[in-house]
Design a protein with these regions (language model features):
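Accessory cap/linker subdomain of secreted extracellular hydrolases
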Residues: 113-229, 248
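Loop/turn elements at helix/coil->beta-strand transitions in domains of secreted/extracellular proteins
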Residues: 21-27, 73-76, 102-107, 229-233, ...
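Alpha/beta-hydrolase active-site loop
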Residues: 44-67
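Short, surface-exposed "cap/lid" segments of acyl-processing enzymes
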Residues: 1-23
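C-terminal catalytic histidine-bearing segment of alpha/beta-hydrolase fold enzymes
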Residues: 212, 217-219, 260-322
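Short beta-strand/loop motif that positions the catalytic acidic residue
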Residues: 230, 235-242
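Primarily recognizes the serine-hydrolase "nucleophile elbow" in alpha/beta-hydrolase
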Residues: 60-133
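Short beta-to-alpha linker loops that shape the active-site pocket of alpha/beta-hydrolase fold enzymes
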Residues: 25, 30-34, 274
Length: 322
């Protein structure tokens, strides 16, 4: 299975170029259930286990530093992108709240993360990649809490209900190849809403959208990152055009939550203009949903175009406090 210990991994390479090559000691851990972890599954977007995994990796790096001749300053900075943005924020929250004397947290840069998971359940339109990310989240939380559904067939339509609980994460197939091999619906001409409706039972989604005491909604609330007060400097970064983790649902809600308590140590940056200028045809986002350019642009926005711009913003914050 995939490991961030592989220097050829594109995310590892980006971290090496953006941070390690600039003098930072980078700790990039594999999560529970990946690589050499013996955990029985991956608790996807489970804030508490993300936090303990990241903090344990910092402890391990500190223990190993002297053996490789590294002198660490003791300053800790957290960053992550997408799921990693959720994990880095969960880690900063836990470090400041529970281990303030152990970790000298000086900054957190949380990039394109899904911080408002319960809010995202109430949005009527599906995200890009819904047929991958949402079943991943639902089956993970079912394994964590055991309450999300009583029978997999009440949540998922056939044939997906037959194998979805053991499909994700997949040791050999990624989102694209899961779709092209027919394990998940999708492909040219299939909209996110159509893909969602092929996978999920409509009653299951409607109940979650209603909120209240619905078990999926309650699980999402447990893993929201709203409502905490960071002590160190925080950067939120994303691109307004992101179709997978829309900032309107997550980044703006997170910033508004911080603002509601008068916090002055949080900045929020939108890199959409940079993404458009660099990757949009003629420097603008394509507007025709039926065009190949539209599919290419939005298909690459979250995973390829946006990350380097947000990591550059993160490093600027870290450079100011290192």
């Amino acid at each position: 299975t995939r490991t961030l210990a592989n220097p050829q991994d594109s995310e590892t390479f980006l971290l090496a170029a953006m941070y390690a090559a600039q003098g930072y000691a980078v700790v990039a851990t594999d999560y529970l259930g990946f690589a050499k972890s013996t955990y029985g599954y991956h608790p996807y977007l489970h804030a508490d286990s993300e936090a303990t995994t990241v903090l344990d990796s910092v402890r391990a790096a500190r223990a190993a530093a002297s053996s490789v001749g590294a002198n660490l300053s003791g300053k800790v900075m957290f960053t992550g992108y997408s799921q990693g943005g959720h994990a880095s924020m969960a880690a900063q929250r836990a470090a400041e709240r529970d281990y303030g004397t152990e970790f000298n947290v000086v900054a957190g840069a949380h990039l394109a993360g899904p911080y408002n998971l319960s809010g995202s359940l109430r949005v009527p339109d599906a995200i890009a990649g819904v047929q991958f990310f949402v079943p991943y989240l639902v089956t993970s939380w079912q394994k964590v809490y055991g309450t999300v559904y009583t029978d997999v067939k009440t949540a998922f339509k056939t044939p997906y209900s037959d194998y979805i609980e053991s499909l994700l994460p997949n040791p050999t197939l990624n989102y694209t190849t899961l779709v092209t091999t027919g394990k998940l619906p999708g492909g040219p001409g299939v909209t996110p809403n159509q893909a969602r409706d092929l996978v999920f039972q409509p009653e299951f989604l409607a109940a979650a959208q209603a909120g209240g005491s619905n078990p999926l909604f309650v699980a999402a609330q447990k893993n929201d990152l709203l409502g905490w007060n960071p002590k160190a400097r925080v950067l939120l970064c994303g691109g307004a055009g992101d179709p997978t983790v829309p900032p309107a649902i997550h980044q703006r809600a997170m910033k508004a939550d911080f603002d509601s308590r008068g916090l002055t140590n949080v900045a929020s940056v939108d890199v959409d203009a940079l993404v458009q200028a660099t990757y949009g045809p003629g420097g603008k986002a394509p507007t025709d949903p039926a065009s190949a350019a539209f599919a290419t642009y939005y298909g690459n926005y979250h995973g390829t175009y946006e990350p380097p711009f947000c990591h550059a913003q993160a490093r600027a914050v870290f450079d100011a406090v290192k």
